[in-house]
């Protein structure tokens, strides 16, 4: 694509400020910025922008709660046998989404490097990898881990694993790849500069994971290794139960394309997407898209009608990922208004705004659910599997995450009727290398 064609795209999309900036640059710097614009495929990006403008925020004519398999009503022994067989046959791999930085924690490194275990200060990466290692040893299979990073943390993540990861897993069984970046716009629709010759970019959301798997040939690797099922989780939830044979067995028994764990919401305002049936299809509706009157509505028993929230724990059939990414995966884009640092050509300085000044474009992984032929929603319990690390303080903070880990293991001690001095105030941690399930622990 020539410079003239780039300029035409910018002009057609009212990018007059950027065109003016291009004209004011030296020839060398202008060439660099043009090259960066080419790499970002801005023509496709503007189609994304137009597509989000055309979308209605809530576009369903009929919506009702999804059918959820409740934890207490599932025949675990039946489904466990299916899951254990798949694990022992090496048909399961693990997919960790780890593209985030720890900035909101006051930690300027990949979030997975944050030390979070309450006693030993193990990092998120180590906690997850030790679970995976222990699962492989327990079920007798070679554990494979696929890690999606971002351009902002890829190199540091790979370096961290090269220096530490061989203590947890065989590095030859870890596959790293980056998700795609997209530009952002300000509130007036102008592309945002991060430097004199470069645009601000950000990852395209966890929904970009499926296409990233395909584009980076990860699904081809999975097929060669005989992997049929992918256990998806996000790096910032250290309580996620990896290699869960019951959940996996439910997925296999039901011949599902996608299975998702959900839990009862704390209250109507909790910021999690809800499991629903919209226009006849299972889906997760993002909390910000669910009308308020539906969010607070209760059933005859006094429970929230839309009671079950998604916690980003899924199982995908690899064949399903292949099927929906054969040509191109057209998941909807969602806008997120954020504080975005920007370069000012007028002053020559990088400015950090105090209030949201721009719009990022993101895809959500759960928007692939309506494309599935069969979906399973399975209830898990908050204390068992959800202690996300999002913030330095407040909800989903360092403290609440550490407390959640400690409570999880203290419950093991209680079930085993093991007590010690000052038990209630004690901080407890059990290594996954010792036990990954209570049955092993006791």
Identify the function of each model-found stretch.
Residues 166, 171-263, 269-270:
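Conserved beta-loop-beta/alpha segment of the NTase-like Rossmann-fold superfamily
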Residues 226-231, 239-243, 248-423:
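Catalytic core of tubulin tyrosine ligase-like
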Residues 6-7, 81-84, 217-221, 247, ...:
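Generic recognition of flexible, low-complexity loop/linker segments
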Residues 3-175, 183, 192-210, 219-220, ...:
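N-terminal glycine-rich phosphate-binding loop and ensuing alpha1 helix
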Residues 99, 150-151, 179-180, 215-216, ...:
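Fold-independent oxyanion-binding glycine-rich loops
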């Amino acid at each position: 694509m020539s410079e003239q064609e780039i300029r035409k795209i910018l002009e057609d999309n009212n990018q007059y400020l950027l065109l003016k900036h291009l004209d004011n640059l030296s020839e060398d710097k202008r060439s660099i910025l043009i090259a960066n614009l080419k790499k970002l495929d801005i023509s496709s990006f503007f189609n994304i922008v137009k597509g989000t403008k055309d979308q209605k925020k809530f576009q369903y004519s009929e919506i009702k709660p999804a059918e959820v398999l409740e934890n207490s009503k599932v025949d675990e022994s039946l489904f466990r046998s299916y899951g254990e067989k798949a694990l022992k046959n090496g048909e399961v791999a693990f997919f960790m989404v780890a593209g985030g930085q720890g900035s909101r924690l006051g930690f300027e490194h990949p979030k997975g490097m944050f030390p979070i275990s309450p006693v030993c200060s193990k990092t998120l990466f180590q906690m997850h990898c030790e679970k995976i290692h222990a699962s492989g040893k327990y079920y007798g299979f070679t554990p494979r881990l696929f890690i999606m990073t971002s351009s902002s943390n890829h190199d540091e993540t790979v370096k961290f694993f090269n220096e530490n990861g061989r203590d947890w897993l065989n590095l030859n069984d870890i596959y790293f790849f980056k998700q795609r970046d997209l530009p952002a716009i300000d509130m007036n629709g102008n592309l945002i500069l991060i430097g004199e010759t470069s645009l601000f970019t950000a990852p395209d959301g966890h929904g970009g994971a499926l296409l990233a798997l395909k584009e980076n040939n990860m699904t081809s690797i999975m097929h060669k290794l005989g992997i049929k099922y992918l256990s998806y989780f996000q790096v910032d939830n250290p309580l996620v139960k990896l290699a869960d044979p019951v959940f996996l067995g439910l997925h296999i028994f039901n011949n599902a394309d996608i299975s998702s764990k959900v839990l009862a919401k704390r209250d109507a305002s909790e910021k999690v997407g809800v499991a629903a049936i919209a226009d006849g299809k299972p889906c997760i509706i993002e909390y910000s898209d669910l009308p308020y009157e539906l969010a607070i509505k209760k059933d005859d028993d006094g429970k929230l009608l839309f009671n079950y929230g998604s916690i980003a724990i899924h199982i995908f059939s690899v064949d399903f990922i292949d099927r929906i990414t054969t040509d191109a995966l057209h998941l909807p884009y969602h806008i997120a208004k954020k504080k975005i640092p920007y370069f000012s050509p007028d002053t020559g300085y990088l400015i950090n705004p105090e209030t949201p000044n721009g719009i990022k474009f993101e895809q959500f992984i759960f928007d692939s659910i309506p494309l599935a032929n069969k979906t399973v929603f399975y209830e898990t319990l908050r204390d068992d599997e959800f202690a996300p690390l999002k913030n330095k303080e407040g909800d989903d903070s360092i403290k609440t995450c550490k407390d959640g880990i400690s409570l999880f293991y203290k419950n093991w001690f209680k079930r085993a009727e093991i007590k010690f001095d000052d038990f209630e105030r004690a901080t407890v941690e059990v290594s996954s290398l010792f036990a990954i399930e209570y049955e092993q622990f006791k």
